[in-house]
Swiss-Prot record:
One of its GO terms (molecular function) is toxin activity. The gene is cit 1-11. Belongs to the cationic peptide 06 (cytoinsectotoxin) family. This is M-zodatoxin-Lt8h. Insecticidal, cytolytic and antimicrobial peptide. Has insecticidal activity against the flesh fly S.carnaria. Has antibacterial activity against the Gram-negative bacteria E.coli. Forms voltage-dependent, ion-permeable channels in membranes. At high concentration causes cell membrane lysis. The keyword Nucleotide-binding does not apply.
Length: 129
């Protein structure tokens, strides 16, 4: 709501500035009136669009929840991927690897995956050379 008030104040200020310009002849006066009418129409459209965005708090909440869901799914994916890599690398069962991953922090899991895939990318790059 406060964004709407600020935008309305800016529009009013620009309208006052535009109307305060002196018009020297009738031709210029007609031209200024035409410009003001066009500006008023543009402002009306802009304010209408701004009114549609008045539900910004609700929109922010929606994307915040969506981001949290995506982040949660990514963390689950990282855990599964790390467990799979550990099981393959160390020759242990999947359950043992998952238990090992559960003892790791989120940061440790991400670092482990970055190291693993970094080494893999480096090996592929060196093979191409």
């Amino acid at each position: 709501m406060k964004y709407f008030v600020v935008a309305l104040a800016l529009v009013a200020a620009f309208a006052c500035i535009a109307e305060s310009k002196p018009a020297e002849s009738e031709h210029e006066l007609a031209e200024v009136e035409e410009e003001n009418e066009l500006a008023d129409l543009e402002d009306a459209v802009w304010l209408e669009d701004l009114a549609d965005l008045s539900d910004l708090e609700e929109t922010r909440g929606f994307f915040g929840n969506a981001w949290k869901k995506i982040k949660g799914k990514a963390e689950k994916f990282f855990r599964k991927k790390a467990a799979k890599i550990i099981a393959k690398k160390e020759g242990i069962t999947k359950e043992e690897a998952e238990a090992k991953v559960d003892t790791m922090s989120k940061k440790q899991i991400k670092v482990y995956l970055l190291k693993h895939y970094g080494k893999k990318a480096l090996q592929k790059a060196s093979e191409k050379l």
